[in-house]
């Protein structure tokens, strides 16, 4: 318990000396195109998310769509991961391994896709309703979407990275939810994971100052119950809530612009 507490406290205060790469205009355009493809992949798969379909079937469709559009999946082969996406139903917080789980009416589902197009990375995820969700599940999903929006609204030159996590955690806690602190957002674009870590629970005024040309993900994971996670020992990836209560997540790849931000993966304006 003490170790968990120390881990939590470390996430409240950022190191100020993190080296964050500023992308060039050429790099930004490449990352933008890859990010748009990632968003289009999530849109493509939407009609297939329905009762009776397995998460492995969804992953197979995603892999083909990405390949047909001249890209590859960053997750496939990453540290031995075997699939083109992470698909996380219900109590799965993140990194859900596609398998023979059959979707059923009332499930909530997160699909996370990272594309590599011409060497550039774009990363996004969103929630889907399988059939008709319960009011309990819908409130969690909609609050998580609001958390992402509030985090993005903090993004502008001169703001601190910690302002993002503060906005997210304030809204989640006000609605009776917890914020996962064992996983976070990250720099992205030239690599799958770059500096900085983007914590979703943090103190305002802490962390590096945001500058034009920075690109990173914001991807809050909000739990209906406790914040802690447990890793499935059978696959080494799937992270579930410690109490098996529902979890939800949304993610955009964010570019800091001259006077604010651009969500590079926001092609359709649906979250």
Feature-to-residue mapping (PLM):
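Active-site neighborhoods and metal-handling regions in enzymes and metal-associated proteins
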Residues: 2-271
């Amino acid at each position: 318990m003490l170790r968990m507490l120390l881990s939590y406290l470390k996430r409240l205060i950022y190191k100020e000396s993190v080296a964050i790469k500023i992308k060039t205009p050429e790099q930004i355009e490449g990352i933008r195109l890859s990010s748009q493809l990632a968003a289009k992949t999530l849109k493509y798969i939407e009609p297939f998310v329905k009762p009776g379909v397995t998460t492995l079937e969804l992953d197979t469709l995603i892999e083909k769509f990405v390949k047909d559009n001249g890209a590859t999946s960053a997750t496939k082969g990453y540290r031995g991961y075997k699939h083109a996406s992470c698909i996380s139903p219900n109590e799965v917080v993140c990194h859900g391994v596609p398998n023979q789980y059959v979707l059923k009416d009332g499930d909530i589902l997160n699909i996370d896709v990272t594309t590599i197009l011409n060497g550039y990375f774009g990363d996004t995820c969103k929630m889907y309703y399988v059939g008709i969700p319960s009011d309990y599940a819908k409130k969690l999903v909609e609050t998580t979407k609001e958390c992402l929006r509030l985090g993005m609204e903090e993004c502008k030159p001169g703001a601190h990275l910690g302002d993002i996590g503060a906005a997210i955690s304030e809204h989640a806690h006000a609605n009776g939810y917890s914020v996962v602190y064992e996983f976070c957002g990250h720099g992205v674009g030239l690599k799958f994971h770059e500096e900085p870590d983007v914590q979703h629970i943090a103190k305002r005024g802490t962390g590096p100052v945001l500058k034009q040309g920075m690109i990173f993900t914001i991807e809050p994971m909000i739990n209906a119950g406790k914040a802690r996670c447990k890793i499935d020992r059978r696959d080494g990836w799937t992270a579930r809530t410690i109490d098996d209560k529902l979890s939800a997540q949304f993610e955009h790849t964010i570019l800091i612009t001259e006077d604010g931000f651009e969500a590079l993966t926001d092609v359709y304006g649906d979250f």
